[in-house]
């Protein structure tokens, strides 16, 4: 079993008529993702790559029975798109958009929680259950079906580690890019809990980075897990006070250093790799 999304997931693409929306819709369709609808206000009644376009998510749910959404909408309008999906009854919302204002992120975070939906992102590469479905912008050719779950704050590091696992013959059950902003819809612990309960997943890779306390909080949960966890923390040489790529990747007041996160993960029983290749090798040792 995959977590969050699988071959039964019916997807609506919000922003399907834009360049990014159309480009990634084609890639997702080629992978086998069941894209049943697109949404762009004012473009209802048209088609993109054979996918019917509606004016609203509510209409897409009613007409095409969509139950998941992937959002390619510019930052000023992305929060409204997320909240529209939640209000329409969509249960899995993947927001790729970067640069959403913090107050907008807070509003959409709580609206999604109130609706009982799952939000992946924002500012994330999406989610893939290899061989089943893909919602997002990941390079699908590097993944293969298997029993290693990956949860990550970093897109490119996810790709590196997944590629290395695949090279070693280790496939993935589901790969979740939770996003690099300070406010995200789904955190490490929520995904770790799903992997812990998933019969198909035999080991988990956690990819963290400097900033915040998410990895330390995850370490507390890892203590209680029955499945082995291998970690990687980016930013070992990052200078304090300087944002390193993601809005959440900043060390402030001595909190959020790579050293503190590595120490917490190791104390919880996780093994921590120094390089993406070493992470894959540690997983191979365990399995």
Curated annotation (Swiss-Prot):
Keyword set, alphabetical order: Ligase, Nucleotide-binding, Tricarboxylic acid cycle
Residues noted as binding substrate in the record, renumbered to the chain: 159
Binding positions (CoA): 17-20, 43, 96-98
MF (Gene Ontology): nucleotide binding; succinate-CoA ligase (ADP-forming) activity; succinate-CoA ligase (GDP-forming) activity
Disulfide bonds: none
Reactions performed catalytically: succinate + ATP + CoA = succinyl-CoA + ADP + phosphate; GTP + succinate + CoA = succinyl-CoA + GDP + phosphate
Domain of life: Archaea
Pathway in which the depicted protein is active: Carbohydrate metabolism; tricarboxylic acid cycle; succinate from succinyl-CoA (ligase route): step 1/1
Cited PROSITE patterns: SUCCINYL_COA_LIG_1 (PS01216), SUCCINYL_COA_LIG_2 (PS00399)
Biological process according to GO: tricarboxylic acid cycle
Active site, UniProt feature: 246
Cellular component GO terms, alphabetical: succinate-CoA ligase complex (ADP-forming)
Record EC number: 6.2.1.5
Entry's transmembrane regions: none
Pfam families per the UniProt record, alphabetical: CoA_binding (PF02629), Ligase_CoA (PF00549)
Function according to Swiss-Prot or TrEMBL: Succinyl-CoA synthetase functions in the citric acid cycle (TCA), coupling the hydrolysis of succinyl-CoA to the synthesis of either ATP or GTP and thus represents the only step of substrate-level phosphorylation in the TCA. The alpha subunit of the enzyme binds the substrates coenzyme A and phosphate, while succinate binding and nucleotide specificity is provided by the beta subunit.
Family note: Belongs to the succinate/malate CoA ligase alpha subunit family.
Quaternary structure and interacting proteins, as annotated: Heterotetramer of two alpha and two beta subunits.
PANTHER family, per database record: SUCCINATE--COA LIGASE [ADP_GDP-FORMING] SUBUNIT ALPHA, MITOCHONDRIAL, SUCCINYL-COA LIGASE SUBUNIT ALPHA
Protein name: Succinate--CoA ligase [ADP-forming] subunit alpha 2
Protein source organism: Archaeoglobus fulgidus (strain ATCC 49558 / DSM 4304 / JCM 9628 / NBRC 100126 / VC-16)
